[in-house]
Amino acid sequence: METSGWIQLAIFLIALALITKPMGLYLAQVLDPNGRTWFDPVLRPLERGTYRVMGVDPNKEHDWKQYTFAMLLFSLVGCVFTYVILRLQNFLPLNPQKFGAVNPDLAFNTAASFTTNTNWQNYAGESTLSYFSQMVGLTFHNFVSAATGVAIAAGLVRAIARHSAKTIGNFWVDLVRVTYYLLLPICLVFAVFLVSQGMIQNFKPYTKATLVEPMKVQVEKKNDKGETIKGADGKTLIEEQTVAEQNIVQGPMASQVAIKMLGTNGGGYVNANASHPFENPTPLSNLVQMLSIFAIGSGLTYYLGRMVKNQKHGWTVWVAMVTLFLGGVLLCWWAESSGNPIHHHLGVPGGNMEGKEVRFGIFNSALFATVTTDASCGAVNSMHDSFTALGGFVPLFNIQLGEIIFGGVGAGLYGMLVFVVLAVFIAGLMVGRTPEYLGKKIEAYDVKMAMLSLLILAISILGFAAWAIVSKWGLAGLNNNGPHGLSEILYAFSSGAGNNGSAFAGLSGNTPWYNTTLGLDMLFGRFLMIVPILALAGSLVRKKVTPASAGTFPVHGGTFFILLIGTVLLIGALNFLPALTLGPVVEHFLTAAGKLY
């Protein structure tokens, strides 16, 4: 754990702290329908025109049921829209490589993935999708799925801030304003910055380069439809090919990568994602991309404090998130720096560099892995499947917590607020008082909705993983046995339900069974979790505020900080402890004993 790593970690944390307040203040203006921003002269006419085209009355707010219905309807239409584009790709423009239509099961998986802000990819973008599909089918969802998450967080915060009311905002207004005033302007500047660092942005056909020395590679055997071929034992067949030419990818990459990071989407333009030199050219681009992943989630904690008129509460939530983040990044960094025990027994010194870009090294790989799984981003600059057992445990555990450490844009805050409600409920039980949160009584219905959202996540992950483990279709995708194979399955369904999108890529997921189950897993983890959270918002907004007294439990300071972290670790982690013990924990001890999988 070198000094340079500590310096880079300090720079990252200082930069994150510095952008939190400005981002929070700007979010407050964006999420206020009457708020004014620098972009009003240009964007206000566009905003009003959008409302007219959509037939939306921006002055009419929704109750929680109307808000939920609008969100579900919009997401359904968007999912079908993307599915149709992928199925008709061969008839659509901007397809210089002449890619064919995407298979039905893969098209469903991809449409569900990008609709839910997951961006799980059972395909390689550079060999499957046209420029039109990338821009219109996927980048569209990168914007609106991120805006949807921020809108839901805003609705919950309004419900906490208001009292004796019925409405939590207008979903369509929140969606439009977040997209126009927050995501588009920042992404425009961000994309120009990425181009300045060396990222490509064009519509050229792929460049063909002849290799000086042809090379032999082993690849999965596929049929004419691009589907992998299985042997009699259910394993994927491998064939040897000689490669004499290389296709160098081109296309509108910078514009997609900007929103991919800022919107915590994570889906790579190319299969190698942020480890590819086109998607992440320099150390500076690497740092800025990591900061952009946390930027909106961090700013939302300040927005929370401002809206409830208790800025100390917002900062306490922020500090709790940073503390959990530091715990993860330090464990992952230590595990990867310690290296593989089997290599050490053979006299090979050094940390674990397998699956990592030499230009990023161990620290930046560990930091990026922690950031991308604390948020529901899923972009990677290294291969998580190649991490040590404990190093891989960290991203898996982060996802299973619900990615509430800054989290996906919006999703991180509303996920953490669920734990806040449970924390004050536990505090009330311990002191024998009716639990209160910012003057509002937390009753049985509120706790049920909070717990239901957490149980849906756990059931989606563990239920689908259990099905995969006992079914021939699930086991057919495994290329590793033992605890590591279990970890790969757990990671896949955790990533799906948690709307993360990263993977332990040793699992062959592009099969009809995995495409279907992972697609359902993503939809359940996104929308079935959001409904009880909005129901909680509907309950909180109707409550009266009780004046604070000497016995009121404060929602800022050290006591609340400790209770919140304890609630996150106890309730969030205990659901998955048995499965984690059988996966990465057992693998760690077996690796130390000299056994690999």
Task: Spell out what each predicted region is.
Residues 2-597:
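Membrane-proximal intracellular helices of multi-pass ion channels
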